[in-house]
Amino acid sequence: MSHSVKIYDTCIGCTQCVRACPTDVLEMIPWDRCKAKQIASAPRTEDCVGCKRCESACPTDFLSVRVYLGHETTRSMGLTY
């Protein structure tokens, strides 16, 4: 079952989610719109196991990284960003 990993622009570039991911789904890429000049990216979502460790590691009040398991979407979960 495939999972969707979304990175939102509230990412502060701290790398916590990247370090927490056991399957290396996430990586940091250059991005000029935050203080750290980098943002998380999810180029390998097919490797996501749905553990949500990246979500747990995110220090922002509004989770910058979200994992949607299988058929979950922002709409089905009642979330709109």
Swiss-Prot record:
[4Fe-4S] cluster 2 binds at residues 21, 48, 51, 54. Residues 2-31, 39-68 form the 4Fe-4S ferredoxin-type domain. The keyword Transferase does not apply. It is a peripheral membrane protein. Its EC number is 1.97.1.12. [4Fe-4S] cluster 1 binds at residues 11, 14, 17, 58. It is found in: Plastid thylakoid membrane. Keywords: 4Fe-4S, Electron transport, Iron, Iron-sulfur, Membrane, Metal-binding, Oxidoreductase, Photosynthesis, Photosystem I, Plastid, Repeat, Thylakoid, Transport. GO terms for cellular component: chloroplast thylakoid; photosystem I; plastid thylakoid membrane. It is an enzyme of class 1 (oxidoreductase). PROSITE patterns: 4FE4S_FER_1, 4FE4S_FER_2. Binds 2 [4Fe-4S] clusters. Cluster 2 is most probably the spectroscopically characterized electron acceptor FA and cluster 1 is most probably FB. The keyword ATP-binding does not apply. GO terms for molecular function: 4 iron, 4 sulfur cluster binding; electron transfer activity; metal ion binding; oxidoreductase activity. GO terms for biological process: photosynthetic electron transport in photosystem I. PANTHER family: PHOTOSYSTEM I IRON-SULFUR CENTER, PHOTOSYSTEM I IRON-SULFUR CENTER-RELATED. The eukaryotic PSI reaction center is composed of at least 11 subunits. Apoprotein for the two 4Fe-4S centers FA and FB of photosystem I (PSI); essential for photochemical activity. FB is the terminal electron acceptor of PSI, donating electrons to ferredoxin. The C-terminus interacts with PsaA/B/D and helps assemble the protein into the PSI complex. Required for binding of PsaD and PsaE to PSI. PSI is a plastocyanin-ferredoxin oxidoreductase, converting photonic excitation into a charge separation, which transfers an electron from the donor P700 chlorophyll pair to the spectroscopically characterized acceptors A0, A1, FX, FA and FB in turn. This is Photosystem I iron-sulfur center. It comes from Cuscuta reflexa. The gene is psaC.
